[in-house]
Amino acid sequence: MRTALLEVGLEELPASEFYNILEQLETRTRELLKANRIQCDSIEVFVGSRRFGVLLRGLPEKQEGFVEEKKGPPLNVAYDSKGAPTRALEGFLRKNNATFEDIIEKDGYVYISRKIEGKAVEEVLPEVFEDLVMGMSFKKPMRWGTGEYEYVRPVHWIVAMLDDRVLNLTLFGLRASHVSYGKRYHSGALKINTPEEYYEVLKSGYVMASHEERKKSVLKQLEDFERTYGMKVERDEALIAEIVAMTEYPRILVGQFDQKYLELPEEIIVTAVKHHQRAFVAHKDGLTNFFVAFQDGPQSSENVVKGYERVINARLEDARYYFHKDLEMSLGEMNERLKGIVFQERLGTLYDKVERIVKISRKICGELKFPEDFTEKVLKVASLCKADIASKVVYEFPELQGVMGRIYALKEGMDEELAFAIEDHYSENPETVIGSVLGMADRLDTIVGNFAIGNIPTSSKDPYGLKGKADTVFRIVRKNEWDVSLEELLNFAASLVGFHLSNDLEEFFSSRFYQFLINEIGVSYDVARAVNHLWKKPLRGTLAAEALQNISERPEFQDLFVGFERVHNITKKHDSREFDGALFEKEEEKRLMNKFFEVKEKVLKALERLNYEEALQYLIELKPYIDEYFDNVFVMVNRDDLRMNRLGFLKNIDDLFMMIGDMSHLVKRT
């Protein structure tokens, strides 16, 4: 078996493209090998800050062969009445360079059928590698030189090998070779004799090509630090991923900032160290003044550590100044300053937005029938929930929006529960009821406001993150089990910005509810479609989806499905619900009517208690009565009064089912 290597060497990749490239390499390599009929024992992809590529192990000598079939003329055209080949058949064979031995007959036609041998793998791999490299997509590609080429970053070298031979491949005007390059300023050209030695050769040039190896190295160095210093470092996965993406030879650095800054709230210190310097803070019976960073390369680290310490101390000195200046103002005074900060063009200032949040929060509390004293607490927090945006610390560290609101509120003596809600309302999954009310109100205002001024997301663009905000609204409703009318809340929020519930807005929430049910509740696509019309009452829609999903996995699902299907199919074009039981002629009609009234009462009571599983069980009881009805009653009779009466009656049954879901969307389970 054979081994192949592709490495594309570029200028430094942006960290934001790292995992995009990694995912594409894994997916496209597998797809291209399959499309070219090349078996492979293992596919190893690698991405570094200056390179990416694949290592293929266990390749065959050649592609798999295949049988090619090409359709020719019909039999009655290919042969004359005596069975002799016609000129049409001869021309077909000549055109395809085939012989009579290649002919088969199938479905009344002549076909050429012949086995095509696979090409040698060294002939095919250059095409595979070219398709792989040139078929990748990037968020912001760039041009270089004369502008002839466009790619994620300028390409400087290509390595393409099969065993010890260089493949015939040219990309971006560069001919492939067996020469790679190590760490900039620390290593020159690196000759690769075979793909098998690739990783070790690059290590000699201070490059860990494997991102998995770099991650293991980072974690090992963090463990060594903890063991040596007796401290703990929080494993921030996002930060670790960023370090893995930005370094090719990560090496730990240990530094200290001035102890006087430990008087600052821990959140400020962590943000200054982690978010702004990509370093970890260390704990030992609380936060210490130690930090851990990673440099790229083997160079002496003393000057680098001093550089980190200088920058972090400067950032913390600024933060300390801003923090103490902020403490000279109350949250109420900060809130007044929101009058000078624009929220969005045509949607007013942040102060205007806060006023709308207060009003929407009151509406939500009213819908949920919260006690007045609790509502007053909600509104108190709502009126201050954006105040910290006017603070100096948040201006310098935007990541602390909400966090500083909580800290300043506590400094003013606000109850801890209320102070935490200021931070909590920013969460995509708020922990508190107050945070949930504010989070929902805030997001409804943002979504409706953007639709009002024409900022409508598309399938590919959502610059204001409205899809995620809608998902959070549904998440809040489900978590808190709030039986609210989203339609009513949207209409109210829209009225505050001179808007209305448009078709675009309805379709947006309907589509997000569908995705929410699939991605977060975990129901199947057909179940999500069945209840999607219930998005205006999202708790009920979610509970209906969960109940339908559960019953669809049980034997009685067939009874439910068939019962609905028989009623729904005959009534879907009928609108009237009017019927008169006195016009029923057959006992089967009367029995179904009596059972329907009995079941309807039970179903409505179950739905009032939000027990959709119980409601479905009651609906199943209708199945034998529905079967008996259709076996003995002809609905579409010639008499208009009887036909309309029967359809009106059945439409009532259909409506009862539809309160839980449109089961015509459900796929029959076997």
Swiss-Prot record:
Any one Gene Ontology BP term: arginyl-tRNA aminoacylation
Q: Which SUPFAM superfamilies match?
A: Anticodon-binding domain of a subclass of class I aminoacyl-tRNA synthetases, HD-domain/PDEase-like
| GO MF term set | arginine-tRNA ligase activity; ATP binding; glycine-tRNA ligase activity
For this protein, the Enzyme Commission number is 6.1.1.14
**Reactions catalysed:** tRNA(Gly) + glycine + ATP = glycyl-tRNA(Gly) + AMP + diphosphate
Please state the protein's primary subcellular location.
cytoplasm
Keyword field contains Protein biosynthesis: yes
EC class name? ligase
* Alphabetical list of InterPro entries matching this protein: DALR_anticod-bd, Gly-tRNA-synth_bsu, Gly-tRNA-synth_heterodimer, tRNAsynth_Ia_anticodon-bd
Q: Which UniProt keywords apply?
A: Aminoacyl-tRNA synthetase, ATP-binding, Cytoplasm, Ligase, Nucleotide-binding, Protein biosynthesis
Single GO cellular component annotation? cytosol
Q: Where in the cell is it found?
A: Cytoplasm
Superkingdom to which the source organism belongs: Bacteria
Give the NCBIfam families listed for this entry: glyS
Q: Which family does it belong to?
A: Belongs to the class-II aminoacyl-tRNA synthetase family.
Q: How is the subunit organization of this protein annotated in UniProt?
A: Tetramer of two alpha and two beta subunits.
Q: This protein is called what?
A: Glycine--tRNA ligase beta subunit
The organism is Thermotoga neapolitana (strain ATCC 49049 / DSM 4359 / NBRC 107923 / NS-E)
Give the gene name.
glyS
